[in-house]
């Protein structure tokens, strides 16, 4: 049966599953369910998710050191518990074993070189690390820094899978056109892409910090168009008195800086291709990332402007905002990875 499973296809499936795990993590956050399973890897001492409020209370009485950060009387709905339970199930029961299986399959394929083996080992190390960070996030009651670390580790793991897929496709001679990078243009753009990708990731972290810090979401006000967005409390450049509570302002400044860099990159690579340089793959990826980023700015604005005195924000917009931000980073990081692989191939 294992002979029928191909590394390239399994790796592609793992990339999709990882993106779903990240999305489920976002669902956990928007439903405020990060502490709905206060222990790890079990959930209120069981492997189930259908736990009544009475059963939750009994567990807290037996574990007085594990009181919820929202107060001793706080209880969770079955749906909230299910979101965290499903997130753990998909990551630990589905994703983890398949990553190990992929590692074994890589070593059975004679056509695959040392880079593929290295990438598969990195993926295994990162999935183990991600499990440890997940435990830490639970232990720290979803502190903002632990949530950002958990998200960053997930993106690093997904990037290792993309690296594995690209290297496998190259070794098998099955690279599609969209994954074929011109080494001349790659040499010019690799460092630029590294800096832009890093800036995009840092901006993503700042957004995660805002969304998990009490009061930060409303720090620019809830007075609607212009006053709350694009301005902040009616000011274009408000003074910073509290770096934590006003982290949304800093996040917005970072967003503007990255978007300017992306627009500049899109223009420069368009000019270079127009002057006879090949490399349409790189151009499409940079343009795609720029387009995603622009759309995501609109999603972020819609989230801020969605405030309602009764229902608060439309939290599903926050989830879309997270996923588009993650996708933008992954597109840019894939462009950097592809450029690096193309340069290594030319140098070998």
Residue positions per predicted region:
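Polytopic transmembrane helical bundles with strong interfacial aromatic enrichment
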Residues: 1-348
């Amino acid at each position: 049966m294992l002979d029928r499973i191909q590394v390239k296809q399994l790796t592609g499936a793992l990339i999709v599953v990882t993106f779903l795990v990240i999305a489920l993590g976002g669902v956990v956050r928007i439903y405020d369910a990060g502490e709905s399973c206060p222990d790890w890897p079990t959930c209120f001492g069981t492997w189930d998710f259908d736990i009544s409020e009475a059963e939750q209370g009994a567990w807290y009485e037996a574990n007085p050191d594990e009181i919820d950060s929202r107060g001793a009387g706080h209880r969770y709905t079955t749906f909230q518990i299910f979101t965290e339970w499903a997130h753990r199930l998909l990551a630990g029961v589905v994703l983890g074993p398949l990553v190990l299986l992929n590692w074994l399959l890589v070593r059975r394929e004679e056509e695959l070189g040392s880079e593929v083996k290295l990438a598969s080992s990195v993926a295994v190390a990162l999935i183990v690390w991600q499990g440890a960070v997940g435990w830490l996030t639970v232990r720290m009651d979803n502190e903002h820094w632990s949530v950002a670390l958990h998200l960053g580790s997930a993106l690093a793991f997904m990037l290792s899978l993309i690296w594995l897929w690209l290297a496998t496709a190259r070794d098998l001679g099955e690279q599609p056109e969209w994954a074929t990078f011109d080494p001349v243009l790659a040499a010019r753009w690799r460092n630029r892409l590294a800096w832009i990708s890093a800036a995009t990731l840092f901006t993503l972290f700042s957004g995660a910090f805002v969304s998990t810090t009490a009061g930060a979401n409303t720090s620019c006000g809830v007075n609607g168009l212009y006053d709350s967005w694009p301005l902040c409390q009616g000011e274009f450049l408000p003074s910073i008195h509290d770096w934590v509570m006003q982290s949304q302002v800093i996040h917005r400044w970072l967003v503007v800086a990255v978007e300017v860099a992306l627009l500049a990159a899109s223009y420069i690579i368009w000019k270079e291709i127009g002057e006879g340089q090949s490399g349409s793959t790189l151009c499409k990826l940079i343009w795609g990332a720029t387009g995603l980023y622009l759309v995501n700015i609109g999603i972020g604005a819609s989230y801020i402007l969605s405030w309602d005195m009764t229902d608060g924000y439309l939290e599903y917009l926050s989830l879309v905002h997270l996923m588009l931000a993650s996708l933008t980073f992954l597109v840019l990081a894939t462009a950097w990875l592809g450029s690096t692989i193309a340069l290594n191939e030319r140098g070998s």
